[in-house]
Amino acid sequence: MSVVKIKIESLYKIFGTNPKMGMEHVKNGVGKDELLTKYSHVLGLQDINLNIQEKSIQVIMGLSGSGKSTLIRHINRLIEPTAGKITVEDQDVMAYDKNALRNFRRQKTAMVFQRFALMPHMTVIKNVSLGLDMQGFKPEEAKEKASKWIEKVGLNGYEEKYPQHLSGGMQQRVGLARALTNDADILLMDEAFSALDPLIRKDMQDILLGLQSELHKTVVFITHDLDEALKIGDRIAILKDGKMDQDDLPADILLNPKTDYVKKFVEDVNRSRVLKAKHIMQKLNGKDISKAIKVNEDDFIEKFIDRIVEEKPEMIVVQDKQNKNVGYISSKRLSEILKK
């Protein structure tokens, strides 16, 4: 049974001299553009409701100005909301006083930024252990913990190097190691890989997924890259002009877009690379499978599409990890999915 780790309810953020007044205008139907031109206020977020599951990667995506970075900064109250409620493990984050909020930021959450945010005068190991030093850990213990995570992200031998000696990808590994060293349950990643070259970005995505399979953190990941979102997200929330357009499983974002905006967002995606057999299979219900070929439920369509073209089977049987038949895909359905 899934557990809600972070719950966001009716969240509004209006930037300006009188945000409460601005919010009333928004509730009365004033749009983002009119709010800016007529009332000189900026609509950051409008009535956001989102449940983020424990031990999952929740992707929040949208174009520039959609509100995604504003939203993630509300979780640890780097930005205060105009209205709404945020609870973490059933605790009201809005009710925290300064000390409680400070402890929450130190112990429960960690952030990884797009621009790395490393201390240029500190070595790699000092950057990674910075949070532990601020919490009062003994130097030996802080160094031991930091060394463990430096190894985990593949930076052995770079402990005494300075940030300027590292490539962008290596600097972001330092940022990730620093976040993980604090052993926080919640990892907030704001466009963490967006500034990296494509190959380095792919490496970082793989590192994150590998670590997540071991650590099972609750990760909130901001991106404007749909391919990245589909690769790493357990769920994807798409924002437009500060409003939530759709929050769904990656396969459902692709197969069942709920708005024209989401439909346009996903129209150029190579479905064979991101959809697995289990995403498109149907129940067997006594179907004759004697002439079917077999694929694993976690196989991407791309993996078996050539075989389909060559063998032209009437049906594809989908099996789980125990080789049990769990569903089927007809050639017609596969063709329809790839043509959408």
Residue ranges and their predicted role:
Residues D247-D248, N256, Y328:
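ABC ATPase "signature
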Residues Y162-L166, M170:
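Conserved ABC ATPase signature
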Residues S290-P313, V317-Q322, G327-K340:
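The conserved cystathionine-beta-synthase
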Residues H25-E34, Q91-D92, D133, E140-G157:
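Conserved ABC ATPase "signature" region
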Residues T181-D185:
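A short, proline-enriched helix->beta-strand linker immediately N-terminal to the Walker B motif
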Residues D241-G242:
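Conserved ABC ATPase "signature" C-loop
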Residues G84-D92:
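Conserved ABC transporter NBD signature motif
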